[in-house]
UniProtKB/Swiss-Prot annotation:
GO terms for biological process: protein catabolic process; proteolysis. It is found in: Cell membrane. Keywords: Cell membrane, Membrane, Transmembrane, Transmembrane helix. The active site is at S110, K153. Signal peptide: none annotated. This is Uncharacterized protein MJ1318. The keyword Transmembrane helix applies. It comes from Methanocaldococcus jannaschii (strain ATCC 43067 / DSM 2661 / JAL-1 / JCM 10045 / NBRC 100440).
Length: 602
C-alpha cells in the first residue's frame, strides 16, 4: 500500500510540475469581447492562455463561461494560419487554448486574429506587448476579417490598460443609430491609438516588435512559357469551335422564325455570345490564353443552348432525347477521364477532369429536374452546359497526353491528404455557418457531401477538388471586403512557390489569369482563391510524395527584428462593412454556387 501511495505521489508531482511548466511558458494574451448587460452591450477584456506542445495536430479548447462554436472553429483556423506564417508543420504540435472571462460574452470569432498571434508567439518563443489588443476574425489565407462591436471593443482595450487597438481594415467608420462614428477619433478620446490591419502579417509587429515577411518566390520563366504553350493550343481549339458554331447558328437563326418572344430572346443570346467571342479573340491576341478559353467557353454554352432550343422549337429534337444523348455522352467522357493513369506530371489535369465530370453530372441532374417540372427552357440550358462541361473534362485530361515522363501515383498515398482537405472544408463551412447563421448554404453542404462520398469511394483526387470547391465558396463572405491586392499577391506567391518546386501549376495559373481579366470583385476574389488553393494543392501533393521537400519549405521564413521593423499604417476610405455585409451577404453563396447566372471557367 505504501509503495502504491508513493508511486501516486510521484505521478501527481510530475503532473503538477508539468502543469506549472506549461503555465510558466504559456503565452497569455488579452482580447476584447462584448457582453450583454442590463445597460446594453459593453466591451470587456478576456484572457486567453495558449500552450503549444509536441503532438499530432490537435487543437484543444477550454472556455469559461462557455462560448459559441464559432470560437472553436476560429481556434483551428488560427492554428493552421500560425503554422503557415511560422513555417511550422502543425501536424507535429498540439495547441491548448484556455479562455477565461468574468462575464458571459457574445460570440467568439472576433478573437481569431488574437489567437493566431498568441499561437505564433508560442511557436516562436516570443514575448508579447501587453499594451496592444486586437479584434478581427482570422481567415484561412491570413487576412483579418470584419467583426461587430468595434466601439465597445475599444472600450474593452481601455479597461485592459492597452494603448493600441488593432481593428480590421475597412472598419474605421461605424454606424451608431444612423450616425457615422470614426473609430480612430473615438479611440483618441480614450487615449487609445486605433490602427487598421488587413492581415496577420501586418498585426505581428505591433505585438512583438518583430516582422515576419511572407517569403516571396520569383516566377519560373521556363514553366510560365510551358503553361502558355499548353494554353495557347487549347484556346485555339476552343476558339475555332466557338467561332464556327457562331457562324452556323447566325445563318440558321436568320432563316428561322420561332415566334416573337423566342426569336428576340435567342437573338439577344446570340449577340451576347458574339461579345464574348470578341473578348476571347482580343484576349488571345494579348497572350491571355486561359482567359480567352474561358470567354470562348462561356460563348459556347450560350451557342449550344441556342442550337438545342432552336431544334426543340422547330420540332427537330425533343428535350428528353437531347438529355438522354447528353447523359450517354457524359458516361462515355467519364470512362475516358477515369481510364487515365495518374502521374506526378499530370495529377492536376486528371483532378481537373474529374471535378468537371462531377460538375457535368450535377448539371445533368438539374436538367432532368427541370424537365420533369415541365421547365424545358431551363432543362435545355442545364443540358447544354452539362454537355460542354463533359467536353472540358476531356480537354483537361488531354493537355499532357504525350508527356510520359511522370511516375505513376498510387492514389492510396493521397488518402491522408484528402482527409486533411476534407477536414479543412468542414471546419471552414462550420465556421461560416456560425458567423452568418442566415446565410443559405445548401449548395455548400452538397459540395461537402460530394467530397465525403468521393472519399468513401476512394477517389481521393476528387475529394480534394470537391473540398477546395467548398472552401472557396465558403470563404467568399469572409474576404469579400478584404484587401483584394492581398488575395492577388497571396495567390501569385503560391504559384511561384509551386513553380520553384518544378511544378507546372496549370489550374492555378489559369485561375489567376482569369481573375485578372474579370471586373466584379466577387468573381475576382473567387478565382484568386481557386488559384491559391490549387497551387497549394500542387505543393501538398508533391510534399506528400516526397517528404524531404516538406522540410525544405517549412523552414523558409524571413524575420525582421527590433530597430529594423518599419510599420506602415494604412487607413481605408470611408465605408460601413457591417451594413454592406447585411445588404448582400445572402446573395454571395448563391452567386458562387449558381451555374447559369455567372461566368464560368473552362
Amino acid at each position: 500500500m505504501k509503495t502504491w501511495r508513493e508511486n501516486m505521489k510521484k505521478i501527481l508531482t510530475l503532473l503538477l510540475i508539468t502543469f506549472l511548466l506549461n503555465s510558466a511558458f504559456a503565452v497569455i494574451i488579452k482580447a476584447p469581447a462584448v457582453s450583454l448587460t442590463d445597460r446594453g452591450y459593453v466591451g470587456v477584456p478576456i484572457n486567453i492562455q495558449i500552450n503549444v506542445t509536441k503532438g499530432d495536430g490537435h487543437v484543444f479548447m477550454d472556455t469559461m463561461p462557455l462560448t459559441e462554436l464559432d470560437m472553436q472553429g476560429s481556434a483551428r483556423i488560427a492554428a493552421k494560419v500560425a503554422g503557415e506564417v511560422t513555417g511550422k508543420d502543425m501536424s507535429k504540435y498540439n495547441v491548448y487554448i484556455t479562455v477565461r472571462s468574468d462575464v458571459p460574452v457574445v460570440g467568439g470569432p472576433s478573437a481569431g486574429g488574437t489567437m493566431t498571434i498568441g499561437i505564433i508567439c508560442e511557436l516562436m518563443n516570443w514575448s508579447l506587448n501587453k499594451h496592444v489588443m486586437m479584434t478581427g476574425t482570422i481567415n484561412p489565407d491570413g487576412s483579418i476579417g470584419p467583426v461587430g462591436g468595434i466601439l465597445e471593443k475599444i472600450e474593452a482595450a481601455k479597461k485592459a490598460n492597452c494603448t493600441i487597438m488593432l481593428i480590421p481594415k475597412g472598419q474605421r467608420y461605424v454606424e451608431v443609430e444612423g450616425n457615422k462614428v470614426d473609430a480612430v477619433e473615438f479611440g483618441k478620446k480614450l487615449g487609445i491609438k486605433v490602427i487598421e490591419v488587413g492581415s496577420i502579417y501586418e498585426a505581428i509587429p505591433y505585438f512583438t516588435n518583430k516582422k515576419i515577411i511572407m517569403k516571396e518566390y520569383p516566377e519560373n520563366p521556363l514553366i510560365e512559357e510551358k503553361y502558355k504553350d499548353i494554353m495557347k493550343e487549347l484556346s485555339e481549339n476552343v476558339l475555332k469551335t466557338a467561332n464556327e458554331k457562331y457562324e452556323n447558328l447566325s445563318k440558321e437563326l436568320s432563316n428561322s422564325y420561332v415566334g416573337y418572344e423566342y426569336q428576340k430572346a435567342l437573338l439577344n443570346e446570340l449577340t451576347t455570345s458574339k461579345s464574348l467571342l470578341e473578348k476571347a479573340n482580343d484576349e488571345y491576341l494579348k497572350n491571355k490564353y486561359y482567359s480567352a478559353t474561358c470567354s470562348a467557353f462561356n460563348a459556347l454554352i450560350k451557342l449550344e443552348t441556342i442550337e438545342h432550343t432552336l431544334k426543340y422549337l422547330t420540332g427537330e429534337e425533343d428535350v428528353k432525347t437531347f438529355l438522354t444523348e447528353v447523359q450517354n455522352k457524359i458516361s462515355h467522357d467519364k470512362e475516358i477521364v477515369y481510364s487515365k493513369n495518374v502521374t506526378t506530371n499530370n495529377f492536376e489535369e486528371i483532378l481537373a477532369g474529374r471535378i468537371r465530370i462531377a460538375e457535368a453530372e450535377k448539371l445533368l441532374d438539374n436538367a432532368w429536374k427541370s424537365y420533369y417540372l415541365g421547365n424545358y427552357d431551363e432543362a435545355i440550358k442545364y443540358g447544354s452546359f452539362a454537355k460542354l462541361r463533359g467536353d472540358s473534362a476531356i480537354w483537361w485530361v488531354s493537355l499532357k497526353e504525350n508527356d510520359n515522363n511522370g511516375k505513376i501515383i498510387n492514389e492510396a498515398k493521397l488518402k491522408s491528404l484528402a482527409q486533411q482537405y476534407l477536414d479543412n472544408a468542414e471546419t471552414i463551412l462550420t465556421y461560416v455557418e456560425t458567423l452568418f447563421p442566415n446565410l443559405p448554404t445548401d449548395d455548400l453542404e452538397n459540395d461537402l457531401e460530394s467530397a465525403k462520398e468521393a472519399y468513401k469511394d476512394g477517389d481521393y483526387l476528387l475529394t480534394i477538388a470537391e473540398s477546395i470547391d467548398t472552401c472557396v465558396k465558403a470563404e467568399i463572405p469572409l474576404v469579400i471586403f478584404g484587401d483584394i491586392e492581398y488575395s492577388k499577391k497571396y495567390a501569385r506567391n503560391k504559384i511561384n512557390l509551386a513553380e520553384n518546386l518544378g511544378i507546372t501549376p496549370i489550374s492555378a495559373l489559369g485561375y489567376y489569369e482569369y481573375a485578372n481579366s474579370l471586373n466584379d470583385t466577387i468573381s475576382k476574389i473567387m478565382y484568386y482563391k481557386y488559384s491559391s488553393y490549387y497551387a497549394q494543392m500542387d505543393i501538398d501533393v508533391i510534399k506528400e510524395l516526397n517528404k524531404s521537400i516538406s522540410e525544405n519549405i517549412s523552414s523558409e521564413i524571413n524575420i525582421v527584428t527590433n530597430e529594423n521593423v518599419n510599420i506602415e499604417e494604412t487607413t481605408t476610405k470611408e465605408n460601413n462593412v457591417g451594413i454592406m455585409i447585411s445588404a448582400i451577404i445572402g446573395g454571395l453563396i448563391g452567386f458562387a454556387g449558381g451555374y447559369l447566372a455567372r461566368r464560368v471557367s473552362a
